[in-house]
């Protein structure tokens, strides 16, 4: 089933999609948060900012991020959804940038921007600076991973540290995505195909799509 922007009456770019426990679909769209209940579409703007990232937390809040801000939606007593901006609580000297991804475990929600993470835990927001461009990020079994020009990194306390034997990522391999498969990480490179990290060694993973991958720029991926 395909829906055009004339049907859902919002922007023509959709960046992220999630399905709520109730079956409703939520989408990060240029015009805001799209909601589809199977029959009707609704659009909820975030102060007219373009949205880029979306996640549904264990608390059933719909976390959203975009250009210069992040926050969450929750049901309104009058129907529909109400928006709360979390980034308003940051010091005026802090630049949010663009929120590209939102990660969650049972305790934290982390909003990933260009070079830092803003992590919400117990109602407080902390900031983790990476000091290099972040290419992709992922949570696997409550462990936070990300790739940057420094390689594959894992969150250790309040900082990201390099994962052993993955220095090729970042220095020669730019990533377009991270995927979890069984007990391994699949690294989707921009133009060099797939790599697999098994916990100790990073190796190239040959597929029938290698030629396609080398001739095109990959920016996202999913496992079915």
Features from the language model and the residues they span:
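Carboxylate-rich, polar loop motifs that coordinate divalent cations or form catalytic acidic clusters
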Residues: 1-224
